Each structure stands twice: as C-alpha cells, then as structure tokens.
Amino acid sequence: MRLNNDCVRDILLSVEEVCDFNESFRYSKFSNDFERLQPYSHDEIIYHIKQCELAGLITSMFGADGGDYLEVGDLTPEGHKFL
C-alpha cells in the first residue's frame, strides 16, 4: 500500500483531539465515529496507524480482533512535530 500523508495527518489530528491524561484513541472497524477518517477504508486506516507507530509518531498502540479494534495512547513529540 502506498503511504498517504493526508491519511497520516488525519489520524494524528483525530488522536490529538481525543487523547488526554485519562483518555486514549479507540478505533473500531464497526464504529468509525471520526469524521476525518470517513474518507478512508478500514484497511487504509489500520495500515497508516501501524505506520505511525513504526515512525514513532504515536505511543502505546494495541490491536485486537485481527485489527478490527485499535487503541492508541497518545501522540509522541515527533507526532506533534509532524502536525
């Protein structure tokens, strides 16, 4: 899959909006409530979240149910710089 920087940016902006000291970003294939992520397929979102983790842009990625559910702790300093 080709890396889409717009998708990466939309994911990071969505994570930034949701996350705080007590709240993490939760994405589910079955209930994508994030307006910024609506233009992207589930596979695109999962791929780009994993790329964000590999690039050190997000912390604490957790996946379950074969990738149908993902949880992200927050942005890293590099994630904030990217934005």
Task: List each model region and its residues.
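Short, charged/polar micro-motifs that form catalytic or ligand-binding hotspots
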Residues: 1, 35-39, 65, 69
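Short amphipathic alpha-helical interface segments
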Residues: 2-37
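Non-catalytic, well-ordered alpha-helical scaffold segments
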Residues: 5-9, 43-46, 55, 77
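Generic structural signal for hydrophobic core residues of well-folded globular domains
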Residues: 15-19, 52, 83
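Short amphipathic alpha-helical interaction segments
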Residues: 38-55, 70
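A short, conserved structural fragment
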Residues: 53-64
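Short, amphipathic alpha-helical interaction segments positioned at domain boundaries
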Residues: 67-83
